[in-house]
UniProtKB/Swiss-Prot annotation:
Keyword terms, alphabetized: Cytoplasm, Protein biosynthesis
Compartment(s): Cytoplasm
NCBIfam families reported in the protein's UniProt record: frr
Family annotation (Pfam families): RRF
Source taxon at top rank: Bacteria
Protein name: Ribosome-recycling factor
GO biological process: cytoplasmic translational termination
Gene Ontology cellular-component terms listed: cytosol
Presence of the UniProt keyword Cell division in the record: no
Gene from which the chain derives: frr
Predominant cellular place of this UniProt entry's protein: cytoplasm
The family this protein is said to belong to: Belongs to the RRF family.
Length: 186
């Protein structure tokens, strides 16, 4: 493996870690309605579990409501059950094939819990980044040991790997800070 491929692989892995963080943060509830809240909801449909988005269309008519338009009338009760089981703190109100989910305002205590959870997600992502850095540095040591790169080049590349890790770590910090502001805004 050459050094360019190594750097590219490290960057791809770090991008993937950031995408995972982004997905986790989208699932955190802010005071606003967002269809992303329902990403984790699965529904018992036609003998198997399916994501909610495959049995209904989701929309947000206003900042405090999510509408779930179920396509098959026989699925309405399964969708309600799936939303309830997901334990999102949402109470479904059914009107024919339309399920309305009013989003209650977050309490101060719940906001603080969500901020803690966001920080935990951020810390988990930073741990992933450090593990990726460690793997990259081990690969560099192996390349040096196999006389593919010189000691000076190894040192220079290690610094580049560290800089890459620092850059991604600061991206994590800014994503967490932004989510914290979203959550704490009443």
């Amino acid at each position: 493996m050459d050094t360019e491929t190594l750097k590219k692989n490290l960057q791809e892995k770090m991008d993937k870690a950031l995408k995972v963080l982004d997905h986790e943060l989208k699932g955190l509830r802010t005071g606003r309605a967002s269809v992303n809240l329902l990403d984790s909801v699965t529904v018992e449909a036609y003998g198997s579990k399916m994501p909610l988005s495959q049995v209904a269309s989701l929309s947000t008519p206003d900042a405090r409501t999510i509408n779930v338009q179920v396509w098959d009338k026989s699925m309405v009760s399964s969708v309600e059950k799936g939303i309830t089981i997901a334990n999102l703190g949402l109470t479904p109100a059914t009107d024919g094939q339309l399920i309305r989910l009013p989003i209650p305002a977050l309490t101060e205590e719940r906001r603080k819990e969500l901020v803690k959870l966001a920080h935990k997600y951020g810390e988990d992502t930073k741990i992933s980044l450090r593990n990726i850095r460690r793997d990259g540095n081990e690969e560099l040591k192996k390349l040096e040991k196999d006389n593919i790169i010189a000691k000076d080049e190894h040192h220079s590349l290690s610094e580049q790997v560290q800089k890459l890790t620092d850059d991604y770590s600061s991206k994590v910090d800014s994503a967490i800070k932004q989510k914290e502001q979203e959550i704490m805004t009443v």
